[in-house]
Every structure is written in C-alpha cells, then in structure tokens.
Amino acid sequence: PVGTNDKVEQFIRDFLVHKEVKIEVASNPEFLAQGSAVHDTLHAARIVIGTESRHAEKMLQEIYEPFKLPVVSVSRRSAEMIKYACNDFLALKISYMNEIANLCELVGADIEDIARGMSYDTRIGSNFLKAGIGYGGSCFPKDTKALKFIARQYGSQLKTIEAVVDV
C-alpha cells in the first residue's frame, strides 16, 4: 500500500539505530506485463523514481541515464500511487470493454468492430480494448483491491474502482 516505503525506511532506521550507516529508501516501481517482462524492461515507456532525498534521486537518475527514457521523479508515496493508478486504469479499460461487449450482444453490434473503431481515437489508443472474461494477471486483481482498501483507510470511496472490482 501507499506508505510502505515509509515503513520500510523506519524499520531499517530502527534496526540500525546504533550503527553509523546512512541509508536512502526509494520507490522504483516496475510496469511489466505478464509474459513480457524482459521486453517491457528493455522498452519501458518511463522510469518512475520516488524518493524523499535529492541524493537518492540523483543516484537513480544516473543509473537509468543510459536508457534515455523519460524519468518521472516524485515522492515515494506518489511513486507507489502511480503504480496503482496505472494498473487500475488498465483494469478499468478491460472492464469497460467487457461491459460494452455485453451490450453489443444485446443490440446486435460486433465488439471487434467497436474496439477497432475506438482504437483510432488517440485519446483512447488501441491497448486493452479486447473484451474477454475479465482482467487477470498477477497485478490487476490485487492492485484494484489494494487501491479500494487504501481509499477506505483514508475515508474515501473510489466508486469507479469499486465498479471495476465488481465487474
């Protein structure tokens, strides 16, 4: 959940309280699709660096510099949230297309034609428009539930994410 890296840092600092060791904890989420981890690593769209330290941010930027990718430098909590927001948005697209597919069956429209027509809209894109039995993988189910849980912990209700989980 959001705030995990804060807890990790505190745990390490408590453990090292009497040692003269300097640590920096950063969040560096991955954005890999199931079955294409190597490709996704080598052809990433961006690198997200979440840190509370300019020193750690600079070190990670130097590590990633040879890849010539956009680097998004944010706080640790924002980096953790970016991961959830991305995965949950993709789950939303899948759930949406499944709902549209159900309606297409009722009205006699072809979901493949609908998806193809939608895919040319640059605001939508062609990814994640395939209707099916729902979203899966190792991240989407746990991340949608996690974001729903996080929102409730903070007294917020994410109706869209709750609908994605329900669909």
Residue ranges with predicted function:
Residues P1-V167:
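Structural/interface elements that position substrates and couple domains in central-metabolism enzymes
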